[in-house]
Amino acid sequence: MEAEGCRYQFRVALLGDAAVGKTSLLRSYVAGAPGAPEPEPEPEPTVGAECYRRALQLRAGPRVKLQLWDTAGHERFRCITRSFYRNVVGVLLVFDVTNRKSFEHIQDWHQEVMATQGPDKVIFLLVGHKSDLQSTRCVSAQEAEELAASLGMAFVETSVKNNCNVDLAFDTLADAIQQALQQGDIKLEEGWGGVRLIHKTQIPRSPSRKQHSGPCQC
């Protein structure tokens, strides 16, 4: 999808334990944009962090560019991951509905971000991934909804395999960021990369060229 006409850039990170499906979730979302490549079927574990982008027309707001960071869940990469916290405005906290430990660790991930950013700068969304694996599920939707409510965030279940709610998760987070920005709960700040106002002079375009969603040099 072209980034032409985007008013803001929102920097968003996906956090959660290793192997919960963050990479496949992100690549599936990016590949849902017209002209974007298909996601790899078996992505390798993320090394540190990778950046992707997708432009999005908000339901009740302007067109925005999402800068999406896929972070590694392995402990040896945690120091790298933490460096992104202070410059994100949105976080998808992802757990695997078939892996109870990944669900129990959600509060740890949430606390890490809160300790770095504070309570007023980040919009969270809880994502229960791999909802297609009902036979091996060990975390109920009710449990997840209760945790999300206790942490003050919304909850969405997703499945890349069934193409279930992938777009909804990212779109819901983006809409919530825009609403917070409109209401003044989140403010543009010099030197903070969470939300950036995009000026037309910063996006040169040639009539014969198009920009597609995909990995970016962020």
Swiss-Prot record:
Chain residues carrying a lipid of type S-geranylgeranyl cysteine: 216, 218
InterPro entries per record: P-loop_NTPase (IPR027417), Rab_GTPases_membrane_traffic (IPR050209), Small_GTP-bd (IPR005225), Small_GTPase (IPR001806)
Membrane topology label: Lipid-anchor
Chain positions recorded as GTP binding sites: 19, 21-23, 46, 73, 130, 132, 160-161
Assigned keywords, A-Z: GTP-binding, Hydrolase, Lipoprotein, Magnesium, Membrane, Metal-binding, Nucleotide-binding, Prenylation
Positions contributing to Mg(2+) binding: 23, 46, 70
Gene Ontology CC entries for this record: plasma membrane
SMART domains for this protein: RAB (SM00175), RAN (SM00176), RAS (SM00173), RHO (SM00174)
Gene3D superfamilies for the chain: P-loop containing nucleotide triphosphate hydrolases
PROSITE patterns in alphabetical order: RAB (PS51419)
Keyword Metal-binding tagged: yes
Reaction catalysis annotation: GTP + H2O = GDP + phosphate + H(+)
This protein's record includes keyword Cell membrane: no
Cofactor(s) named in the record: Mg(2+)
UniProt subcellular location: Membrane
Gene Ontology molecular function: any one: GTPase activity
Entry's EC annotation: 3.6.5.2
Functional description taken from the UniProt entry: The small GTPases Rab are key regulators of intracellular membrane trafficking, from the formation of transport vesicles to their fusion with membranes. Rabs cycle between an inactive GDP-bound form and an active GTP-bound form that is able to recruit to membranes different sets of downstream effectors directly responsible for vesicle formation, movement, tethering and fusion. The physiological function of RAB42 remains undefined.
Family per record: Belongs to the small GTPase superfamily. Rab family.
Domain notes: Switch I, switch II and the interswitch regions are characteristic of Rab GTPases and mediate the interactions with Rab downstream effectors. The switch regions undergo conformational changes upon nucleotide binding which drive interaction with specific sets of effector proteins, with most effectors only binding to GTP-bound Rab.
Protein name in UniProt: Ras-related protein Rab-42
Lineage: Eukaryota, Metazoa, Chordata, Craniata, Vertebrata
Gene: RAB42
